[in-house]
């Protein structure tokens, strides 16, 4: 993965797209990219566009997937931890929940994950 990141960056690719469930083990792509970023690319952080997604299963339990407020906030918190960052440039909703009207999924994902504010500030949000 390190060689791929270096080659990409050397050829002008600055958008790195991840998700909470990518990797052979959920979260491992973010974890590995976070280590590479910390060790080799942190000086270039302002040149990078880092995105992550949430939506599919990541942990067991009633809030381990889909678009609940609890899931989206927890997932973004965990992605930031794995990446070693305090913000990502883009965070989006990765899955569709058939029982949830699409306008609610889109609205929640947009509000909860696309705002450029501290994740802790989102805890006051009630849909």
Regions found by a protein language model. Name each.
Residues 26, 53, 104:
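Solvent-exposed, flexible loop/coil residues
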